[in-house]
Amino acid sequence: LDSQIEYLNNYQENLRAAQDMGLSTALIEELSDGSAQSAAYLEAIVAGGETVVRLGNEHGLGGRNQEAALAAVPLLRGLCECCFFSLGTDGTDGPTDAAGGYADGQTARRLATCGTAPADALRRHDAYHALQSVKGLLFTGPTGTNVNDVAVVLING
């Protein structure tokens, strides 16, 4: 679980790169110190790259994007109007038919209703079945391109 959360929280290098390119940046934890008007403009955080999943002895089905989405579940729990999704631009994620996964503030509740604990599914590397149970898989079909993975946090501000 720590490696998945690190993926979600490890933004410093991307932040510096964006600043070096002259882009305007904001850290989410700083928004509470800013004005309400400036916070209203934050609508999406987009990241690219590819994460690594280190499989243990026990593993189910899923890919790195599905694991990232499942790892976001406890971070999003109870948040309104905020979601996270991550997908492979080639339309496949790991050895599955899904391109990636989706989670929002209600995903934890929906998983609990299905009897699935996100931490257990992550430990077993079985994000596919966990997300499938709550309709949290993203499907695009093969795209014919493979640029990178794309992860997005959407915030209705």
Name these PLM-found stretches.
Residues 1-70, 74-78:
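A glycine- and small/hydrophobic-rich beta-loop-beta segment
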Residues 61, 70-157:
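Internal helix-turn-beta structural module
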